[in-house]
Amino acid sequence: MAANVPPSAETLLSGAAAHPPKTAEEIANQYDLLPKLIPFLDRHLVFPLLEFSSGQDDDKEIVRAKYELLKHTNMTDYVANLWQEINNSDTIPDEFVKKREEVLAKLQHYQEESAKITELLQDEDVVGNLRSDKVANLKFLEEQHGVTPEMVNSLFDYGRFQYSCGSYGNAAELLYQFRVLSTDNDKVASATWGKLASEILTTSWEAAMEEVQKAKESIETRLFNNPLGQLQNRSWLIHWSLFPFFNYDPARDVLTDLFFSPAYINTIQTHCPWILRYLAAAVITNRGRAHKSSSLYQKQLKDLIRVVRQEGYEYSDPITDFVKALYIDFDFEEAQKKLGEAEDVLRSDFFLVSAADAFVEAARHLISESYCKIHQRIDIKDLSTRLGLNQDEGEKWIVNLIRDTRVDAKIDYKEGTVIMNHPPQSVYQQVIEKTKGAFFRTQVLSAAVAK
């Protein structure tokens, strides 16, 4: 019988003390994705992530990590400064002085080697005679201006060198010029990735999105018979796309659609399931965007719920757990708890920190909408608690929700409740809704069999 005796208050309190709630810093560290992201990023793209970590982690460790990251680049002055900081020294070792001289000499060499062709490509008369046919362009430049294939390749080499020096704007321009003329598909693909990285690092988001599209097309065509190569390249593109994803509003819809497309959602599920964090954040924050159509948003939400359910065994964090709690388990208390943890994770994530407030706002709307759908009479205090608000804030929130969504509800201030008017759905309407889903699934199966 003793085994069935409920635990005493003292036992419960001692247990709570032994497992106190995690701090925001502990939650952030537990769900830090940096080690998973680094293998899919160019070293120059990793640098902003380390810079962001400077205010959160041990500064000495971050400085050392920056040094290890960049020591093989041609950013010699910056690397030398990092070495001085690590070693607490005012002098610069001879190896850095020597490397700096070598870098300057190479820059001079590349500049001279590509001088003729860069001048030609800045001449409006010459550019005006160029067409979409690269072979014809090369023939025209060779016959009229003595341009050789080696001169074209010098643009590629010079662009790569400028990128290694951290001159991303110059690199983007040189790689663009090379791509206009070159017929070397492998080098053109490499130039596209280099230009994408350069546009990201100069925060030229519109140009970056153009390069995302070009990289996507290159993956589909150049690697058509190489499934493993496509998987690897799609994984890179997914990770590189995170930079414009939350920094450039027009990119949000384009990239959300891309990530949900069959080839890319399959890549995420098989190769990098942690990207679900960013997809979930994008879908949830899409709720508050004025131009977003309700039907498209509902479709994205359904797709997200499906993927979170499928991948729960493989990857989870407070953001995906929030989706699971609210839409799979229908556990409002757990959803509230996970929302609090999700906010800590969002504010410590380089890509999501700017979306944290929008996520919390949208998530509260989703909690309240789901809660209101299944309750006829709602206690304002109870709903406020579930939203992580005090009663006054909760009351204002609910008033705004009713006004903004035009839901049929009345607030009884005396009783402190909200009375929801849920019109009964006719049997005919229920049959129609169920038939719609069955008809769609039949179409999908028929299409699959036809293939």
Swiss-Prot record:
SUPFAM superfamilies: Winged helix' DNA-binding domain. Component of the eukaryotic translation initiation factor 3 (eIF-3) complex. GO terms for molecular function: translation initiation factor activity. GO terms for biological process: formation of cytoplasmic translation initiation complex. The gene is int6. Keywords: Cytoplasm, Initiation factor, Protein biosynthesis. It is found in: Cytoplasm. InterPro entries: eIF3e, eIF3e_N, PCI_dom, WH_DNA-bd_sf. The keyword Iron-sulfur does not apply. CDD domains: eIF3E (cd21378). One of its GO terms (cellular component) is eukaryotic 48S preinitiation complex. Signal peptide: none annotated. It comes from the Eukaryota. Belongs to the eIF-3 subunit E family. Component of the eukaryotic translation initiation factor 3 (eIF-3) complex, which is involved in protein synthesis of a specialized repertoire of mRNAs and, together with other initiation factors, stimulates binding of mRNA and methionyl-tRNAi to the 40S ribosome. The eIF-3 complex specifically targets and initiates translation of a subset of mRNAs involved in cell proliferation. This is Eukaryotic translation initiation factor 3 subunit E. Residues 256-425 form the PCI domain. The keyword Protein biosynthesis applies.
